[in-house]
Amino acid sequence: MLDISKIAIGNTTNYAETPADSIRVSLLTCSPHDEIYSLYGHTAIRYEDKASKTDIVVNYGMFSFKKPFFVARFVLGLTDYEMGIQDFNDFCYEYQYFGSQVTQQEINLTPEEKGELLKALQDNYANARVYRYNYFYNNCTTKARDIILKSINGKIEYKNAIDKSVSFRDLIHGCNANYSWASFGNDLLLGFKADMQTTREEQQFLPDNLMRDFGQAKIVSADGSARPLVKNTEIIVKGNDHAIAGKTKVTPQFVFITLLLLIAAIVVAEFKTKKRFLWVDISLLLASGLAGLILFVMLFSEHPTTSTNLQIFILCPLNLYWAIYIIKNKRNERKLRKAWTFLSIMLCIGLSGRLIQVYAEGMPLLALSLLLKNCCNLYATRKND
């Protein structure tokens, strides 16, 4: 790991007096590759000084899976990422290895602004290298954007229009279209706040969106003069067609359609044999209850879009209690009717929530499967009472 503090800042007035400015600052945008963590791309800053033969990449996306409880901390929004400094050639080699494209946009900064940016990067590296990662609001892309824009003496104006009707969920769907199970996992954990409209700045959490906006932006100085934010754009690492894998055949939709048909067959078998396969109900309650515990934990996550998730009425942690309740009262029709009634009401609420929240693929089918089984059980308790 390189150390940015070893790069001399110099006096910003000297920058203005330098006849040939040897410093270039660029935004690097990396396309996705086949690893799940890379599906949304990546952003970094290149700092190049030909006079001192310095060529480094400032990378706000450094993390380690080996840290204790990494997955649990990530889910709860307690993950710390780190600002790292890499050799430019090493950085490019990594993305070339994965087959990702790297696009470079040279930022049109004045010598004074370059000096301010370097000071900010050095201060960031020395005093705030580790930061609390937030997927939508504080990630490698937003960190790079913010530190660049804060160094600019002027107002940023964007020439391109954006679709303000899109939500965070819409944006990530565009990135994981080939990964149905990754999309399912995201949609399962995100609440209805992820379906709200987004601003331009919010949409810039995705590297491609920031690259697009920077390419269409200009800097307006206090005297009214304007200059493009990006001086020039070039592809410095070419990608290949194998970076992203194809779609999987076994999708969540397929799995839940199969489950619905299986439960329908079990219901028919119960009516024909006049027997109840209580082990099926207990298995469904335990499985949905355990999954519901994850949604319950997400209510306390620091991620801003997970605190209100109506899918918890379908995958409900209370199902664990009702599984035990039904086992204890399996011969008491009145108490069983109470259980099946409550469970059916919860599922109806969950299905109604689909009107205001986008659910994970197949979740309505899962709710219908569970509701079908519960309603048949409810009918049986009334008939036998």
Features from the language model and the residues they span:
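A general structural signal for short secondary-structure junctions and capping/turn motifs
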Residues: E17, I36-Y37, E48, N176-S180
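Generic structural hydrophobic/aromatic packing signal, biased to beta-strands
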Residues: L27, I45-Y47, V58, Q105-L109, ...
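Activation targets extended, charge/polar-rich intrinsically disordered C-terminal tails
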Residues: D123-Y325, R331-K335, L343-D385
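Intrinsically disordered, low-complexity boundary segments flanking structured domains
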Residues: G10-A16, R46, N89-E94, I172
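A cross-kingdom signal targeting lumenal/periplasmic-facing segments of multi-pass membrane
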Residues: S64-G154
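Glycine-rich catalytic cores of cysteine/serine-nucleophile enzymes that process amide/ester linkages
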Residues: D21-G99
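Bacterial Sec-dependent N-terminal signal peptides
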Residues: M1-A16, K383-D385
